């Protein structure tokens, strides 16, 4: 790894001489948002662009500390009730006044979003009631203590009830049974700027899939005005064209420049900033019955056997991946979040031991291995397809003949959510900045109604872990909750229910005169890009 510990490695963008002259900013992104609907898909690509338009009751800063946004303060009234004081004088981009009605409408809509690849119900599952408290506050009740509610609501961007066509009065009821919702707009409707209405510093001008997203400054924004009149976000999914666009001046900033190109970029006078992120790159495995797509097993699913899953982990040389594939811009992972984040326990990285891996396969009844397909995106994570190819080669050395099926992110996520892959490579960035996020999303037993395991496409299930996690999430005492999260994570990792590979280190490249503070969550937020003074 090229920098220090997680929280000390964050550095501000280098300030170079001269200020940016243009009032417009063009950013080259490594992947494209799947929707303009802020409640459709828990995907950082979506979140980072929509944070320019929408805001929640709370926000998270570059280190994921919870800060005020549309709520100026909050307090726990009792074990199951929180009171959020709403910011006065806030206007949506359509001119309507922000009020408790918009909060109620937003939280009501979450379970009504159709065909969500990764539902936001994970943040609303405990909410039993949302109601006004006077003219400038809301009371949010939960079905048990929820110490993370102020963090959860940062992940629920608030919609304009007027723009969505709600009735004058919206009454909250759990499970999508709210009253006064009107005809609820779905994801495709948010391609229209008339529906995509928030309170943020930018408004949506246009979104052309495969081409660009254009934002214009919202002059009546309640907070600090951004530096740019117009922002254009272009998906440049191939590394070469993305770097070429920067060096030619077609874009002002890019995310995830290839590691091997950094010297050339810096020599050309551009600044480079980087930070270790909280994103874990991991392998998930089909642990839900038979897997006919796996060859050489007489129809059995070898991934149901813990010994096979452990063999896969021991076959992977994480240090080699970090150095050879990631160029040192990553850190080998032993947990679902990098220490010292809340809930980590310092578990060691699984040792590279191919001989023991072969022995475990033999003990499991697969001395000759088997054949399997590894699914991966090829444009979503840093060097994702290359990492998958390296993993495939390592697995082949212990007898697991691995075919890599690499696709664009949109194709990959669609197939992953259809449970097409017996094993797949993906990533997760903890929106809460602590261990409950990956546990609830990646390894909790899948239950659509309960909002658990929305991204658990391997269908791993550990009822004891589920129960411990449930208890942790209703424990107010931080020390006790952390112990429970540590134990819950240990249960999953001891079971090899999921295999951590590495934590990404995120890199940005900017033209002269621009600055950007790297974020732990890896977001590229245009409104936070500044012209050097």
Where are these regions (language model features)?
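Extracytoplasmic/periplasmic ligand-capture domains
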Residues: 60-62, 87-118, 129-131, 196, ...
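Bacterial N-terminal signal peptides that target proteins for export
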Residues: 1-8
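Long beta-strand-rich cores associated with HINT superfamily self-processing modules
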Residues: 508-533
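Mature extracytoplasmic/periplasmic domains
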Residues: 328-348, 507-511
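Sec/Tat signal peptide C-region and signal peptidase I cleavage site
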Residues: 16-22
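Cleavable N-terminal signal peptides
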Residues: 9-10, 20
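Surface-exposed binding/hinge segments that line
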Residues: 75, 121-180
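N-terminal lobe/hinge region of extracytoplasmic solute-binding protein
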Residues: 28-78, 108, 195-199
């Amino acid at each position: 790894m090229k920098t220090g510990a997680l929280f000390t490695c964050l550095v501000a963008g280098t300030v170079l001489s001269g200020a940016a002259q243009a009032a417009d900013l063009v950013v080259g992104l490594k992947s494209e948002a799947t929707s303009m609907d802020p409640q459709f898909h828990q995907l950082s690509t979506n979140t980072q662009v929509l944070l320019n338009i929408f805001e929640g009751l709370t926000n998270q800063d570059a280190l994921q500390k919870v800060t005020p946004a549309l709520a100026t303060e909050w307090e726990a009234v009792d074990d199951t009730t929180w009171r959020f004081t709403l910011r006065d004088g806030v206007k949506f981009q359509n001119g309507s006044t922000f009020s408790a009605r918009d909060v109620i409408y937003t939280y009501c809509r979450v379970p009504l979003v159709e065909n969500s690849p990764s539902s936001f119900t994970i943040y609303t599952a405990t909410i039993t009631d949302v109601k006004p408290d006077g003219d400038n506050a809301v009371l949010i009740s939960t079905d048990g203590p929820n110490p993370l509610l102020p963090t959860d609501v940062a992940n629920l961007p608030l919609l304009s009830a007027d723009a969505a066509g709600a009735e004058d009065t919206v009454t909250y009821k759990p499970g999508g049974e709210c009253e006064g919702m009107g005809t609820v707009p779905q994801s495709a409707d948010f391609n229209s700027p008339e529906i995509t209405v928030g309170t943020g510093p930018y408004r949506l001008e246009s979104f052309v899939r495969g081409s660009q997203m254009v934002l214009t400054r919202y002059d009546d924004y309640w907070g600090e005005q951004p530096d740019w009149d117009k922002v254009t976000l272009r998906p440049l999914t191939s590394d070469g064209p993305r770097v070429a666009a920067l060096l030619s001046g077609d874009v002002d900033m890019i995310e995830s420049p290839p590691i091997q190109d950094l010297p050339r970029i810096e020599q050309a006078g551009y600044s480079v900033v980087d930070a270790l992120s909280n994103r874990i790159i991991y392998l998930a495995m089909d642990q839900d019955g038979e897997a006919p797509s796996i060859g050489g097993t007489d129809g059995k699913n070898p991934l149901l056997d813990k010994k096979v899953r452990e063999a896969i982990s021991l076959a992977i040389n994480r240090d080699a991946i970090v150095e050879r594939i990631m160029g040192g811009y990553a850190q080998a992972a032993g947990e679902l979040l990098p220490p010292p984040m809340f809930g980590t326990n310092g578990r060691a990285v699984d040792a590279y031991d191919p001989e023991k891996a072969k022995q475990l396969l033999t003990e499991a009844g697969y001395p000759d291995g088997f054949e399997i397909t590894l699914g991966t995106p090829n444009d979503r994570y840093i060097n994702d397809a290359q990492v998958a190819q390296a993993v495939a080669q390592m697995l082949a050395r212990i007898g697991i003949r691995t075919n890599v099926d690499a696709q664009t992110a949109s194709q990959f996520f669609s197939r992953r959510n259809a449970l097409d892959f017996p094993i797949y490579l993906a990533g997760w960035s903890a929106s809460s900045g602590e261990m409950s996020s990956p546990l609830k999303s990646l390894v909790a037993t899948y239950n659509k109604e309960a909002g658990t395991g929305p991204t658990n496409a391997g269908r791993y299930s550990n009822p004891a872990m589920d129960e411990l996690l449930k208890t942790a999430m209703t424990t107010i005492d931080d020390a006790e909750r952390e112990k429970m999260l540590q134990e819950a994570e240990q249960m999953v990792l001891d079971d090899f229910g999921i295999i951590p590979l590495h934590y990404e280190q995120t890199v940005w490249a900017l033209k002269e005169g621009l600055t950007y503070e790297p974020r732990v969550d890896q977001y590229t937020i245009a409104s936070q890009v500044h012209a050097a003074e």
